Amino acid sequence: MYAIGDKVVCPMHGAGVIEQIETRSINDTDQQYYVVSLFLGNIKIMVPVAKESTQIRTVTHKEHAREILNALHDLETEQNSNWSKRYRENMDKLKTGDLIETAKVFKSLVLRNKEKTLSAGERKMLHSAKQILMSELMIALDTEFADLERDIYNAIG
């Protein structure tokens, strides 16, 4: 079980801190929830304590975050030419909550955006992938948003 003050990652949302643990009554059943305040976006989400193993995880350690940042240039990205298949594949990768998969989605969308204008759905996905990736790396590397953003775009090339 996590505690108040723990830094966690919520797949599809990004990194945040557990502000409180509260009990809510839903359908006459009391359930405990983590109230997570996300670092980017000024958003709070509630995660059922009973589902913590699938809905939140701890922030990656500093060494792993550095490895990902250093390997970003060499990460292989696949570009399906069919928009709907590409979108679905990228969404599935983001849903895993895996930092490397999120980095791959971000990189592939950045590179695709350089080639041609992204659709509205892919622009939104690019923004989400960036928020998720940046929030976790900021915490793991203890760095500022602007510095990390510069480093990420330099690593992509």
Residue ranges of model-derived segments:
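A positional/architectural concept
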Residues: M1-Q55
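Charge/polar-rich, low-complexity and marginally structured segments
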Residues: A50-G157
